[in-house]
């Protein structure tokens, strides 16, 4: 009798434990689910082949994302903000899918070359939020398009180049021919001609955004032909333009050779110590495109629940998102005054800057 009573009591205790265990498991599962649904906002960007250290477009975007992360006490990584670097165009789709699997709330594609990959992945993943920088994707509620009036900013550096050249020869080095770089070339050419109709403009393309050696080769040819100011819109390829200008300045400090940078202030890229022991800078100015402002701005809106999917946000002179960089030591006051004059005419609509060469 005692054995039967003990067995019955033991069975009840075991049963109670199972029930409590089941209840505990259910509670844990619910807690885990709640934790996931209430997780902090996360954001990532996929670079083009230039990478975050290209000293140009991608780097500017990454600086904007870092600023957003720090302002919101976020850490770099899958639980905060991060980037995925693309070594080749084949990596675009792979990196976007990796970002989706990592459950980022907002995923940027940095550069127009990621358009096709963003279009495909965003269609397959309609619940994820994406942004394409420097291109437009229409009729997609989970994609925001970010654009810049590059032609307006390029017009202003064209004014600087046209008024600064002593040889009446200036150059333009493009990365890859296309809609975006067309705007840089068209604006620059129009700006030069507006103030110096007799200037010759040598336009060449490297067909790559990440080949500094090609950029240096083109720059060498241009400078040898008498060009004294080169505007590059070529990402990492433009580093070669700076390298060539610095080599020439180092050998002959009296020679006037200038580079106009792009996307971010490239003043530091122009620093050089010449053979006379003195320090110089071959950066005339830079045509800034505040990708950092755009990236930070959209991330802030998305975090607040204001993701404007299906729209295009365009940044221009009116928002100081394009224009000349802060370092202007190598530009005369008279030239800067002309720049302000033409800037106001563009903002007022008195000058319509072309988008195609």
Curated annotation (Swiss-Prot):
Question: Which residue positions does the secretion signal occupy?
Answer: 1-22
Q: Where in the cell is it found?
A: Cell membrane
Classify the source by domain of life: Bacteria
The record, for InterPro entries, names: BMP_lipoprotein, Peripla_BP_I, PnrA-like
Answer whether the UniProt record assigns the keyword Cell membrane to this protein: yes
Extract the Pfam families matched here.
Answer: Bmp
Stated membrane topology is: Lipid-anchor
Q: Where is the lipid attached (S-diacylglycerol cysteine)?
A: 23
The family classification in the record reads:
Belongs to the BMP lipoprotein family.
Q: Mind telling me what this protein is named? A: CD4+ T-cell-stimulating antigen
């Amino acid at each position: 009798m005692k054995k039967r009573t003990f067995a019955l009591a033991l069975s009840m205790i075991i049963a109670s434990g199972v029930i409590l265990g089941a209840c505990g498991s259910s509670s844990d599962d619910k807690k885990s689910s709640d934790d996931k649904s209430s997780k902090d906002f996360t954001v990532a960007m996929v670079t083009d082949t230039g990478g975050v250290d290209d000293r140009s477009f991608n780097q500017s975007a990454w600086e904007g994302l870092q600023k957003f992360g720090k302002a919101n006490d976020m850490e770099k990584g899958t639980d905060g903000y991060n980037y995925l670097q693309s070594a080749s165009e084949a990596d675009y789709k792979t990196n976007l899918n990796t970002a989706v699997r990592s459950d980022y709330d907002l995923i940027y594609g940095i550069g127009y070359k990621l358009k096709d990959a963003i279009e495909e992945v965003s269609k397959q993943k309609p619940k994820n939020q994406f942004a394409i920088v420097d291109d437009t994707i229409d009729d997609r509620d989970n994609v925001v398009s970010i654009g810049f009036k590059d032609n307006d900013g390029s017009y202003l550096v064209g004014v600087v180049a046209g008024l600064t050249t002593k040889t009446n020869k200036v150059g333009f080095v493009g990365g890859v021919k296309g809609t975006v770089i067309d705007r840089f070339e068209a604006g620059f050419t129009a700006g030069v001609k507006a103030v110096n109709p007799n200037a010759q403009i040598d336009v060449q393309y490297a067909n790559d955004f990440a080949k500094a050696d090609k950029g240096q080769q083109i720059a060498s040819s241009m400078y040898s032909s008498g060009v004294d100011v080169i505007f590059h819109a070529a990402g990492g390829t433009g580093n070669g333009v700076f390298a060539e200008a610095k080599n020439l300045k180092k050998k002959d400090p009296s020679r006037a050779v200038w580079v106009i940078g792009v996307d971010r202030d490239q003043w530091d890229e122009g620093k050089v110590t010449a053979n006379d022991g003195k320090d110089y800078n071959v950066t005339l100015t830079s045509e800034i495109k505040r990708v950092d402002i755009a990236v930070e701005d959209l991330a802030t809106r998305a975090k607040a629940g204001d993701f404007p999917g299906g729209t295009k946000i365009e940044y221009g002179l009116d928002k100081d998102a394009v224009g000349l960089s802060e370092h202007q030591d190598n530009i005369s006051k008279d030239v800067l005054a002309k720049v302000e004059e033409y800037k106001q005419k563009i903002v007022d609509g008195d000058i319509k800057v072309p988008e195609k060469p």
